[in-house]
């Protein structure tokens, strides 16, 4: 399992417009190969949004990163200061805490 954390700020759109965008695009992520789950994030006070992605493995994450959807996120003028971090999962303790294994 592999975790990816993506954050960004909104520019030129408000929270309601982003929420509509997220709801319209959620089915696209639900059908994405290798994606176990995406948790959508919104810290409205800080103006920071993003997602936590749980991937089957690093290869599935890399396929997403080289694809059209991720490239569109990075090119979207309404999503600025994009940060992307990824982490391999420690399987042993994650199993103990019911982390999806």
Where are these regions (language model features)?
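Short S/T/G/P-rich N-terminal loop/turn motif that feeds into the first structured element of a domain
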Residues: 1-49, 56-66, 77-101
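A common structural junction motif
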Residues: 71-76
């Amino acid at each position: 399992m592999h975790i990816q954390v993506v954050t960004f700020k909104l520019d030129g759109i408000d929270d309601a417009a982003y929420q509509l965008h997220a709801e319209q695009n959620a089915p696209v992520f639900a059908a994405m190969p290798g994606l176990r789950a995406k948790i959508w994030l919104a810290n409205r006070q800080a103006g920071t949004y993003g997602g936590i992605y749980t991937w089957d493995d690093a290869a599935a994450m890399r396929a997403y990163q080289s694809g059209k959807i991720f490239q569109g996120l990075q090119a979207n003028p309404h999503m600025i200061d994009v940060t992307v971090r990824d982490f391999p999962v420690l399987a042993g303790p994650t199993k103990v805490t019911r982390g999806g294994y």
